[in-house]
């Protein structure tokens, strides 16, 4: 806040509300006035090996607190595309976003506080890859019109060639402004080489500012060709996501996670960290904060 006063603009504070202490961290974030918190049990299950029963229970209360405190949550679907193919598995990202949306609504979180995640992670050598990325981003924006979408930059196919990398980030920024993404994490030209220097971060901000200003209203001016590559790609992804969600509805979310449906990573229902902290609710169990916070 002191730096914000110094530079004359509001700076949002962000932290992670994940692991084995999701509700506790959410409470601390609320007390400290944080603006954004990563809050995603599915990410914890897949990438941090947290037990799925434990973290989904924790996630509910943590999201109740985040919703009450006005904190925007982020979800981690973008990470799926670092381990799975971004073209073939794009529908799993959308399916997970839809699941995460419903889990957030159950916890009383407004749509405007949902930073549902996705990413620009297709192979840059893919023919018409930009059109597929644009289709994915536009589709996500149309399906979640009120959400503060979190859009992640290319990392998987950053080779250390800083010149090509800067162009990849520019294409990513173009799609971000074109499709009105909510939270845009900027790519670094030195991705895959070293932890970014401040000078690298400056170049990334300069890149984004140039494109965001120069292409500010492109999304208002350009319409997509009926049954063209972009529309057909979006339809294909949506259809596959629908089929997958119907399968998950039949089998259950835990079974889907055990089978490695998301991110090509399999996790056992009774494995991972924290299961010993899960117990059945007693008949006299009561948590007054849920009702108070959800009826704010």
Protein language model features and the residues they cover:
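Anaerobic metallocofactor- and corrinoid-dependent redox/one-carbon enzyme cores
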Residues: 1-296
């Amino acid at each position: 806040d002191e730096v914000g006063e110094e530079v004359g603009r509001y700076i949002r504070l962000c932290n992670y509300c994940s692991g084995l202490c999701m509700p506790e961290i959410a409470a601390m974030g609320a007390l400290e006035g944080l603006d954004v918190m990563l809050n995603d049990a599915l990410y914890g299950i897949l990438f941090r090996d947290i037990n799925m029963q434990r973290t989904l229970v924790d996630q509910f209360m943590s999201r109740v607190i985040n919703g009450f405190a006005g904190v925007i949550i982020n979800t981690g679907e973008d990470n799926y595309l670092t381990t799975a193919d971004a073209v073939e598995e794009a529908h799993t990202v959308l399916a997970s976003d839809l699941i995460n949306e419903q889990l957030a609504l159950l916890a009383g979180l407004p749509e405007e506080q949902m930073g549902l995640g996705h990413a620009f992670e297709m192979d840059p050598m893919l023919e018409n890859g930009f059109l597929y990325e644009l289709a994915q981003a536009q589709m996500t924006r149309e399906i979640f019109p009120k959400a503060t979408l979190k859009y992640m930059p290319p990392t998987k196919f950053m080779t250390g060639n800083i010149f090509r990398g800067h162009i990849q980030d520019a294409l990513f920024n173009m799609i971000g402004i074109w499709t009105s993404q909510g939270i845009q994490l900027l790519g670094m030209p030195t991705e895959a080489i070293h932890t970014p220097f401040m000078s690298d971060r400056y170049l990334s901000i300069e890149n984004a500012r140039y494109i965001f200003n120069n292409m500010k209203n492109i999304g208002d001016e350009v319409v997509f060709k009926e049954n063209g590559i972009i529309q057909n790609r979006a339809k294909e992804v949506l259809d596959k996501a629908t089929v997958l969600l119907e399968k998950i509805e039949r089998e259950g979310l835990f079974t889907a996670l055990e089978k490695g449906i998301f991110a090509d990573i399999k996790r056992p229902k009774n494995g991972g960290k924290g299961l010993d902290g899960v117990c059945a609710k007693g008949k006299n169990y009561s948590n007054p904060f849920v009702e108070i916070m959800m009826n704010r």
